[in-house]
Curated annotation (Swiss-Prot):
Reactions catalysed according to its record: (2R)-2-phosphoglycerate = (2R)-3-phosphoglycerate
Active-site residues from the entry: 11 (tele-phosphohistidine intermediate), 89 (proton donor/acceptor)
The protein, known as: 2,3-bisphosphoglycerate-dependent phosphoglycerate mutase
Disulfide bonds: none
Pfam families from the UniProt entry: His_Phos_1 (PF00300)
Species per Swiss-Prot/TrEMBL record: Baumannia cicadellinicola subsp. Homalodisca coagulata
Keyword flag Isomerase: yes
UniProt site (Transition state stabilizer): 184
InterPro entries in the cross-refs: His_Pase_superF_clade-1, His_PPase_superfam, PG/BPGM_mutase_AS, Phosphogly_mut1
Pathway entry: Carbohydrate degradation; glycolysis; pyruvate from D-glyceraldehyde 3-phosphate: step 3/5
EC number: 5.4.2.11
Subunit structure, interactors included: Homodimer.
Gene for this chain: gpmA
Family designation: Belongs to the phosphoglycerate mutase family. BPG-dependent PGAM subfamily.
């Protein structure tokens, strides 16, 4: 018997997604296409009869605005929303803002793929005086220095999400609340890794499209019964 459903969604296409640039913690907004994707996601959820009790998102506007558009389509703009830096995208360090094709030409396909897809390899860190460091951003002012990365591996991203997932999100799901999480490609990959206990190889192969709801159905022990993309024709990922 299904106890509950969880909805995960990666933000709609951002301006830097469109320009093929590393984004990470840089606060870039949705592109025109991204806004369309977010509204379409809201319409799909409405057609499927979804309503929610609580929403989570990151502190980055591309995810926040995606959630806005979805909740507006659902006529649930009033819904309680918690924003957390722990749901941010992976921090890509000194790669942030750089074009992926140009970086590939400079460093080679193998090196760039290691930075992007491996579990434990960290991209080049921001330097100590780089103004892109989170310590210069007011939204992170209450965090300790050891919580603020200069760059992150995928494993580091997963590790920062684990306490938030276990301490904040999972208890709501256990309590029967209907939850939606609007986040980022790598933070959603981290959550899916926790839900499905993915192997390293499975995680590396997992890609999350922009603006498409992922539905998880659970039993009474919060074990996954099934998961699928919500689209005109539903399919497993």
């Amino acid at each position: 018997m299904t106890l509950n459903k969880l909805v995960l969604i990666r933000h709609g296409e951002s301006k830097w997604n469109n320009e093929n640039r590393f984004t990470g913690w840089t606060d870039i907004d949705l592109s025109d296409q991204g806004r369309i994707e977010a509204k379409n996601a809201g319409q799909l959820l409405k057609q499927a009869g979804f309503i929610f009790d609580f929403a989570y998102t990151s502190v980055l506007k591309r995810a926040i605005h995606t959630l806005w558009y979805i909740l507006d389509e659902l006529d649930q703009a009033w819904l309680p929303v918690e924003k957390s830096w722990r749901l941010n995208e992976r921090h890509y360090g000194a790669l942030q803002g750089l074009n992926k094709k140009k970086i590939t030409v400079e460093y080679g396909e193998e090196q760039v793929q290691q930075w992007r897809r491996s579990l434990n390899i960290t991209p080049p860190e921001l330097s100590d005086n780089d103004k892109r460091l989170p310590i210069y951003d007011i939204r992170y002012a209450k965090l300790s220095l050891d919580q603020l990365p200069k760059a992150e591996s995928l494993a580091m991203t997963i590790n920062r999400i684990i306490p938030y997932w276990k301490g904040e999100i999972l208890p709501r799901i256990n309590n029967g609340e209907r939850v939606i999480i609007a986040a980022h490609g790598n933070s959603i990959r981290a959550i899916i890794t926790l839900l499905d206990q993915l192997s390293e190889n499975e995680l590396i192969q997992l890609n999350i499209p922009t603006g498409v709801p992922i539905i998880y159905e659970f039993n009474s022990q919060i074990k996954t019964i099934k998961h699928y993309y919500l689209s005109i024709v539903n399919k497993d990922y």
